[in-house]
Amino acid sequence: MFFISLIRNSLNFIDYFQQKKIIKFFKKNSNKKIIFFDVGSHYGETIKLFSKEFMFEQFHCFEASPINFEELKKNIENLNFKNKYYLNNIGLGYDVGEGFINQTYETSSSTINDFNFDSKYLKRKLKILNIKNDKKFYKKIPIKLTSLDNYINEKKINKIDILKIDTEGYEYNIIKGLSQNYKITKFIYFEHHYDDMIKKNYKFSNINETLKNLGFKKVFKSKMYFRKSFEYIYENKFI
């Protein structure tokens, strides 16, 4: 576990420089006071980062993993936010229901999708993490699922300044669950993996086409360090 923590901390340090580019973009193009949706919150790293540069009118965190959620809850409570925030131990998709999350021991790779154990990329990752048995890499945990539309309607939310999605290959399903309330969403900021480690059953072109059809345009693209992944920001042309 120490070695896995060391790997994660090293990646977090490297990602800091990537995140500076993201923050710079939003400081230039967004309001100082924001309503923020963090889908795939993990331990609250993104909330902590944005809280240093923006004032939250309110924020909503979604973390499907009950294990990750306990750490998220502790970390957010320690930040002592005075404005409204909502911590949701639930997965998001295109419908309401139940499912499973594959909880990895390197917790940031946890995903609702299945892993492709024939993937050379995954085999290399397991080797780096010194995991020799696939079954020791993850365990299945039952979770509840809802959609963004369902949540937004229940909470009577009328504006989202930034919707961030980082759900390890489940991003497209979450975007499909925003078929009504995309109209109130200014920016969608998400990560897309081009490796074959996870069985996504969609391509980046599917996300791009869907967002274009909803009236969004791509305004930012940046490759993440040491990974076959990119971060994208799309802006609603009608807000």
Residues of each region from the PLM?
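Phosphate/nucleotide-binding beta-alpha loop and adjacent structural elements of enzyme active sites
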Residues: 1-239
